[in-house]
């Protein structure tokens, strides 16, 4: 399509080489300790539980109907109690749009959300609570009102001209006409794509990452639309040039801050694609295959979706070093996918929070907020209580909250052990207190019934049985085959970590376990985590 796509990245390499990259990924073993089990220290994001926030909709503290940084600061106690220990803020920069994915100034914060001092205060208060904060980094494109683009568009001789992608004639894909030729903007005309074949653009982006990591002190970035960075010859996604650019980017930002974390959005990626980007290009990728597995197995009452997602992961990403989620800000809210079915919402949360992979919870998911597209309606004000405007603001919000807020809200669910909020809280704390649930190996088991999902999580810290009845009917026809798990030891006790009831130890005769039926009948949507004591 365009010859300039074949530029080499030599200049970029030179640029990043000056930054004396520090090797970072190598885990350092803990010094001798009195604890029996010693493990290599994991990067902080491997054991985190993230919470995605749309700032505009979280909490308004200055009565303008728009959520703000101070609002998040005021709600940090809520988030800490919930148990999350990392936050992803959707775009916080000045922008002409309500969502912020078209940036006007990468060095400033959106004045509607507060001042830079407000933002720094949020960072400090979060740090006090051991909560990490990452922000959206929108690098594929700027706003068409960004000063770079205004200059590039009005003056073809400007050095900013080559910050973007131009052609005399519209080619394949999304080209937009101006007085001085056509520019490429994959998503829409208001978002002109940056030209990463131009080392100057790469230099600008690294200045921006350095500013946020080292001047401001954030912990990393969620990198937007990462598969679209560099188009080559009409190929618009996942090009070798994009991968090459990301490899240099990885070296550069790790040199700026060895503890910095990036997670890339590769929309729709399953484990085989996640694998290509992870480790040498970005720290994490969202695994959409796992997400569909959690949601579809729950919705359909059959284990095939989650079982195949896990099998794909075992093949391509056996350490499950990726991020998981149920739905995000680009998808209908998961409670709407489940038509308001509380049992299903609880089941999906259980599947995600007992599986390996770093979970991301979308704000409001934990109380069962609903929302279906258009996009504005999946990003509505958080429902804090039954007061007017859902307790989000004292004035009419930027967009009205869902009408169910009088029943569905944080205040109503807090302390109610049957609520979705307390279910999330219990599962998050269970995960944090049992590192096996975070990062251990997962071994799928067969129970002879497609309505049952059962696996063992096994590492040096313990052996945990995760068991769920995905259906709305009781199941008594089942038996778990523990022999598939390759367990060497016998067990003398069980500890019920999640779920009601008492159960017995799996019996072993000789080399093999008897078929295991921890409960005669599994109630509809029953969920258990049982620790086996050797
Ligand atoms: Ca406000
Ligand atoms: Ca692009």
Give the location of each predicted region.
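Solvent-exposed beta-strand/loop surfaces of large extracellular or lumenal domains
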Residues: 494-516
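Positively charged n-region of N-terminal signal peptides that target proteins for export
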Residues: 1-4, 19
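Loop/helix patches that line or flank the sugar-binding groove of alpha-linked glycan CAZymes
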Residues: 41, 45, 253-256, 261, ...
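C-terminal beta-strand-rich structural cap/linker in extracellular carbohydrate-active enzymes
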Residues: 508-534
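Sec-dependent N-terminal signal peptides
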Residues: 5-13
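Core domains of carbohydrate- and sulfate-ester-processing enzymes
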Residues: 145-191, 293-315, 379-405
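Acidic/aromatic-lined carbohydrate-recognition and catalytic surfaces
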Residues: 18, 36-206, 210, 226-270, ...
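Ser/Thr-rich, Proline-interspersed low-complexity disordered segments
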Residues: 14-38
């Amino acid at each position: 399509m365009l010859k300039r796509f074949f530029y080499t990245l030599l200049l970029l390499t030179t640029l990043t080489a000056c930054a004396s990259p520090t090797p970072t990924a190598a885990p350092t073993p803990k010094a001798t300790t009195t604890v029996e089990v010693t493990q290599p220290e994991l990067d902080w994001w491997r054991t985190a539980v993230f919470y995605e926030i749309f700032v505009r909709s979280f909490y308004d503290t200055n009565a303008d109907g728009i959520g703000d940084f101070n609002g998040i600061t005021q709600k940090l106690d809520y988030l800490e109690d919930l148990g999350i220990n990392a936050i992803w803020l959707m775009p916080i920069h000045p922008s002409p749009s309500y969502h912020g994915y078209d940036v006007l100034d990468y060095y400033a914060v959106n004045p509607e959300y507060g001042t830079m001092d407000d933002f720094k205060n949020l960072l400090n208060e979060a740090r006090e609570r051991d909560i990490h904060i990452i922000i959206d980094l929108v690098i594929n494109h700027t706003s068409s009102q960004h000063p770079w683009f205004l200059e590039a568009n009005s003056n073809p001789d400007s050095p900013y001209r080559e910050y973007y992608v131009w052609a005399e004639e519209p080619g394949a894909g999304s080209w937009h006409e101006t007085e001085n030729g056509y520019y490429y903007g994959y998503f829409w005309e208001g978002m002109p794509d940056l030209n990463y074949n131009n080392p100057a653009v790469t230099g600008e982006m690294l200045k921006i990452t350095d500013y946020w990591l080292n001047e401001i002190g954030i912990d990393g970035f969620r990198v937007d639309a990462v598969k679209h960075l560099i188009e080559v010859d009409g190929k618009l996604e996942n090009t070798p040039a994009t991968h090459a650019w990301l490899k240099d980017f990885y070296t550069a930002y790790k040199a700026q801050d060895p503890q910095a974390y990036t997670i890339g959005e590769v929309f729709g990626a399953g484990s085989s694609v996640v694998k290509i980007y992870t480790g040498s290009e970005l720290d994490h990728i969202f695994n959409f295959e796992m997400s569909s597995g959690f949601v579809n197995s729950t919705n359909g009452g059959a284990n095939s979706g989650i079982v195949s997602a896990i099998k794909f992961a075992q093949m391509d990403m056996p350490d499950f070093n990726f991020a998981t989620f149920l739905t995000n800000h680009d998808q209908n809210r998961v409670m709407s996918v489940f038509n308001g079915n509380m049992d299903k919402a609880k089941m999906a949360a259980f599947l995600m929070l007992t599986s390996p992979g770093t979970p991301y919870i979308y704000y409001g998911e934990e109380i069962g907020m609903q929302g279906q597209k258009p996009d504005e309606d999946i990003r509505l004000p958080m429902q804090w209580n039954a007061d007017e405007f859902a307790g989000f603001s004292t004035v009419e919000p930027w967009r009205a909250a869902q009408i169910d807020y009088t029943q569905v809200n944080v205040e109503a669910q807090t302390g109610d052990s049957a609520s979705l909020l307390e279910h999330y809280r219990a599962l998050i704390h269970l995960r944090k207190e049992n590192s096996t649930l975070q990062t251990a190996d997962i071994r799928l088991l067969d129970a002879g019934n497609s309505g049952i999902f059962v696996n063992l999580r096994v590492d040096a810290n313990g052996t945990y049985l995760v068991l769920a009845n995905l259906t709305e009917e009781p199941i008594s026809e089942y038996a778990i085959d523990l022999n598939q798990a390759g367990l060497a030891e016998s067990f003398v006790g069980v500890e019920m970590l999640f779920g009601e009831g008492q159960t017995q130890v799996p019996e072993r005769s000789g080399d093999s376990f008897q078929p295991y039926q921890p409960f005669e009948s599994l109630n509809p949507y029953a969920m258990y985590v049982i620790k086996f004591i050797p």
